[in-house]
Amino acid sequence: MEAPPKCALKFSNYIVKHIEFILNEVPEKDEKIRLNVNIDTEIRYNKNEPNKFITIIKITAGEKKDFAKSPVYLSVEVWGFFEVIEEAIDKVRQFAEINSVAILFPYVRALISTITANANIPPVILPPINVAGMMANIEEVKEENTEKQETEAYE
């Protein structure tokens, strides 16, 4: 009997680097809280150990400066620590980046729900996301911004 194939991506640990919660007005118990949510991701590779990397997810929800628009402001930053098996580093880097966000995102969702539920307000429950689609959109925006900056530099 063959051993199952080794997974190319290993999730080692995660830490919560930042939490900020501001309650502007107490919503009614049955009121649904609607917030504008911004999600940002970043991947940092270890120069000394190229098979190790950190995935950072930053989420802000609500308006910090305009409380009239938002009863709640929330900002969290969570770091996940990952490792790729060395034989597969070049082949799976993009795959690993997308999957590391997909692995880490439920922890961030749970953190946000817990913070708001423990604040004794209706919990904010982020929906599941299509990580591959989100990452593709982020890359498109980055490429557009890079092209725009290059164009502006030559004008």
From Swiss-Prot:
Classification via SUPFAM superfamilies: SecB-like (SSF54611)
Classification via Gene3D superfamilies: SecB-like
GO biological process: protein tetramerization; protein transport
A Pfam family assignment: SecB
Annotated GO MF terms: unfolded protein binding
Name used for this protein in its record: Uncharacterized protein MJ0357
Source lineage: Archaea, Methanobacteriati, Methanobacteriota, Methanomada group, Methanococci
